[in-house]
């Protein structure tokens, strides 16, 4: 069975009707704010893509995609997306988006190998976004400015939610704190990556951890990243590797850190080749997506994903993501959650 994290003195603040209304309020308001902040146009996204083109997101490189044959294509295999990280960049080229503008989608995915708990579901829904940037924007300072604008949109949505439902009290700090994964390692050398995230988030409330995917000074990664979307190997102006990271907050309902978004400046030709070599995946250079990038047919970009159910869960102060979205959960998990006051949909 999956793991259940026991909430801290949990009592739902909204009934089922209020919860459904709150979900709609948050989703409508946040996506409007996000699109305005980053100048994004909504586009329609696929649920599945053809296998073998290198378009699907490999996540950490070990997760199996849900696959099925297509009769009218001679049983060619399609994969349900894990995310749209690479598809979005292809779409930027197709739509001929100018620098400073971008796209966002309502992304729905199935991650069959997900380890289920209060935050992780088989079903993933997120706002996947991607924007065209200039060569001179491939800097840490630019990345930070985008993170701050996204965080501002999150806080505005928290304010509206608390105004609509006065029983919900705001808890997000005014500012988000930035730290590199290697600096975090040096602060807490005896802790695991997850324990380091908990410690820094409890200290600052909201944190952006920079440089996830490359090896740190101890020879280990903070967390895995595929080599062909985020740039985690370029040395930034701070002298450290990585132009990507995660937005995390301290979530008092569960007494732990909580990831809301993974994002970053995307690989250019040089960093793609470098990261494929580091990961021993040079054979991927021949795939469709990679050839498009290596032959200068794709724009430079920045992008990421923001969990829809996760954001709703946090802003509505829910103890389990299954209180926000409909998915499949082990019977034992449903029973244990009910014992703690969490009624899964």
Residues covered by each model-derived region:
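Extended, charged alpha-beta segments that form solvent-exposed binding/catalytic grooves
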Residues: 105-199
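A generic structural signal for short, non-catalytic loop/turn and secondary-structure boundary residues
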Residues: 61, 73, 96-99, 103, ...
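Generic recognition of stable, solvent-exposed alpha-helical segments in well-folded globular domains
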Residues: 21-25, 29, 138-145, 288, ...
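A generic secondary-structure signal for well-formed alpha-helical elements
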Residues: 34-42, 150-161, 319
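A translation/RNA-centric and nucleic-acid-associated enzymatic feature enriched
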Residues: 110, 181-345
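Generic structural hydrophobic/aromatic packing signal, biased to beta-strands
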Residues: 23-26, 30, 34, 68, ...
